[in-house]
Curated annotation (Swiss-Prot):
Binding residues annotated for GTP, in chain numbering: G51, A52, G53, C54, N55, G138, T139, G140, E169, R173, D216
Taxonomic source organism: Pyrococcus horikoshii (strain ATCC 700860 / DSM 12428 / JCM 9974 / NBRC 100139 / OT-3)
Protein name: Cell division protein FtsZ 1
Domain of life: Archaea
Keywords on record: Cell cycle, Cell division, Cytoplasm, GTP-binding, Nucleotide-binding, Septation
Molecular function via GO: GTP binding; GTPase activity
Any GO BP: FtsZ-dependent cytokinesis
Gene Ontology terms: cellular component: cell division site; cytoplasm
């Protein structure tokens, strides 16, 4: 058996160093097979809503997300103009005149409802929709739940990925975020929550502007990680139905990320992911887990260590799915991203609906703007 392994390793290494052109005759049904593959391919749309959501999709366009349509949605025309996306939608033109929602979630909600037809057209045909935003402002907080509800009613697996505001951003944004998160959790199959305050535990001396960029990057990694396990050829890919099984009606989810380049890199990366400050919950009751393993040269033994470690820490009946992406730029590092679903979180309770923040709390200072 060992000799067989050595022979395979030698052959593959030889093939990688000396690429040979091999002419493979085309089968008569190849074209038909290509059409079928194209038809059954999962159609994934990523919708960034509001300022933070648009920052996230802008970053996604920079790094690239294989097999996803990127859509930017905002009430602020000036901000939307700067964003890179496959499609842009300025919502609430009548209500906001392209000037934004003024930190009022009610205006964001009404803007999305006003532009329902455009949003539905953009979501048409999607099998899976990611809705990403930063909660606490007006557009993301108000419009994201409306968009998520539309996507879900249209039959798409709907996963929202959101950040909660830093404490330093004030009580008004915190109240807005609480209201928006409860509505979003009800509108989505799964909502992945990233508390920005937890970033400060990782790097307490991080400059404010850099902290926001780190939050954006975590959103990007979450969406890109899940999407490319389905769409991008890798060492081990996930079937869309596997992802649906874990995230359909998955409730509240949280994410942990870890990486290591030591001798025990696999186990250390898994431990870091599950002990990440971002994963601020007891995961022993988690009903599902999605594991994304990335590295330049991930070994089978290492993948097994990671999967076994995560499986031991969640509910014994939890559905655990995993995939491996080859990322040459990681060199000797293994990165592990774990998303646990069906958890109980202090950030979301469904005992009562939080009322929309009062006008006094949310209305910005009135500025007379002359009619153009």
């Amino acid at each position: 058996m060992l000799k067989l392994v050595e022979n395979v390793v030698e052959r593959v290494s030889s093939e990688e160093t000396k690429v040979q052109e091999v002419q493979v005759p085309q089968s008569s049904i190849d074209e038909e097979l290509k059409k079928i593959v194209e038809q059954i391919k999962a159609r994934i749309h990523v919708v960034g809503v509001g300022g933070a959501g648009c920052n996230t999709v802008n970053r996604m366009m920079e790094v690239g997300v294989t097999g996803a349509k990127i859509i930017a949605v905002n009430t602020d025309a000036q901000d939307l103009l700067k964003v890179k996306a496959h499609q842009k939608i300025l919502i609430g033109k009548e209500i906001t005149r392209g000037l934004g929602a003024g930190n009022d979630p009610k205006i964001g909600e009404e803007a999305a409802k006003e532009s329902e037809r455009e949003i539905r057209e953009a979501l048409e045909g999607a099998d899976m929709v990611f809705v990403t935003c930063g909660l606490g402002g007006g557009t993301g907080t108000g419009a994201a739940p409306v968009i998520a509800e539309m996507a879900r009613k249209m039959g798409a697996l709907t996963v929202s990925v959101v950040t909660l505001p830093f404490t330093m951003e004030g009580i008004r944004r915190a109240k807005n975020a609480e209201y928006g998160l409860k509505r979003l959790a009800k509108a989505s199959d799964t909502v992945i929550v990233i508390p920005n305050d937890k970033l400060l535990e990782v790097a307490p001396k991080l400059p404010i502007q850099m902290a926001f960029k780190v939050a954006d990057e975590i959103l990007v990694q979450a969406v890109k990680g899940i999407t490319e396990l389905i769409t991008k050829p890798g060492l081990v890919n996930l079937d869309f139905n596997d992802v649906r099984a874990v995230m359909k009606d998955g409730g509240v989810a949280m994410i942990g990320i870890g990486e290591s380049d030591s001798e025990k890199r696999a186990l250390e990366a898994a431990e870091q992911a599950l002990n990440s400050p971002l994963l601020d919950v007891d995961i022993s009751g988690a009903k599902g887990a999605l594991i994304s393993i990335s590295g330049a040269d991930v070994k089978l033994e290492e993948a097994q260590q990671i999967i076994e470690y995560v499986t031991r820490n969640v509910d014994p009946k939890a559905q655990v799915i995993w995939g491996i992406q080859l990322e040459p730029e990681l060199e000797k590092t293994i990165r592990v991203m774990v998303i646990v679903t069906g958890i109980t979180s202090r950030y979301v309770t469904f005992q009562e609906e939080t009322p929309a923040p009062s006008e006094e709390e949310t209305t910005p200072v009135k500025i007379d703007i002359p009619e153009l």
